[in-house]
Amino acid sequence: MSKVSDLYDVTWEDMRDKMKTWREDNYRNSEQIVDVGEELINEHASKLGDDVWIIYEQVMIAALDCGRDDIAMSCLQELRRQFPGSHRVKRLTGLRFEAMERYDDALQIYDRILQDDPTNTATRKRKIAIRKAQGRNAEAIRELNEYLEQFVGDQEAWHELAELYINELDYAKAAFCLEELILTNPHNHFYYQQFAEVKYTQGGLENLELSRKYFSQALKLNNHSMRALFGLYMSSVHIASNPKASAKMKKDNVKYATWATSQIKKAYQLAGRTMTDTQTSLKAVEDMLETLQITPS
């Protein structure tokens, strides 16, 4: 098999820097990470200094993602030799058991870590991930709520809890979690958009109005979000068609829906400039919007 350095004419420093970029930006290009990382470890370990250990960890996790347990185990053994008794390395052992679906073995490791260090957040999250993998959502929700009582500022945990509530069709609690996220990160368009989707799903005039407002705010924060644009259109259409809506409310929402329609068509026209099937794509969008047109009530 050809070396990465030969194929792409790169130095070991280039490969080391690329691994660092992938690590810091949370890339999940696992096969590339394994290929580049393996070559670095096998041929340039002595030049890497202490960086070699974080690369071992990075390659191990990527190898689990690719189903390469042989590489994962090799990396794990090196880390165990270098850091005997390390909670971080023990957690990697648990990750390997998870990849093998040996969940009870993984849980035993995580429980031992938490006995020594009850505040180990990464390990607590792994236990919750196992509950999800086993389809035990009620337990995952309970443990996440307990976790958030101690670590209320953990945005990742709030979002995970929102997703679990959505899966359980508990939209009111999902909306509460998303509101917490909006409060802590008011410039993230995705949270506004997801909150709007939850409110749209709940239905009813009041929820639809909230949905439209939050889709609008998502668009203000990211005017390229087609999902928010379609959401604005759909929520406006449903409000304008709602028999409980006032005449003014219906008139206003017809305007919002019309504006959203024009923006959607414009976006598809711009995106289609380099496409050979521009007219076909645009016609499909127009037909879809036509089927969703506002009907008098």
From Swiss-Prot:
GO terms for biological process: protein insertion into ER membrane by stop-transfer membrane-anchor sequence; tail-anchored membrane protein insertion into ER membrane. TPR repeats lie at residues 87-120, 155-188, 192-225. Pfam families: TPR_EMC2. SUPFAM superfamilies: TPR-like. One of its GO terms (cellular component) is extrinsic component of endoplasmic reticulum membrane. PANTHER family: TETRATRICOPEPTIDE REPEAT PROTEIN. Component of the ER membrane protein complex (EMC). Part of the endoplasmic reticulum membrane protein complex (EMC) that enables the energy-independent insertion into endoplasmic reticulum membranes of newly synthesized membrane proteins. Preferentially accommodates proteins with transmembrane domains that are weakly hydrophobic or contain destabilizing features such as charged and aromatic residues. Involved in the cotranslational insertion of multi-pass membrane proteins in which stop-transfer membrane-anchor sequences become ER membrane spanning helices. This is ER membrane protein complex subunit 2-B. It comes from Xenopus laevis (African clawed frog). The lineage of its organism: Eukaryota, Metazoa, Chordata, Craniata, Vertebrata.
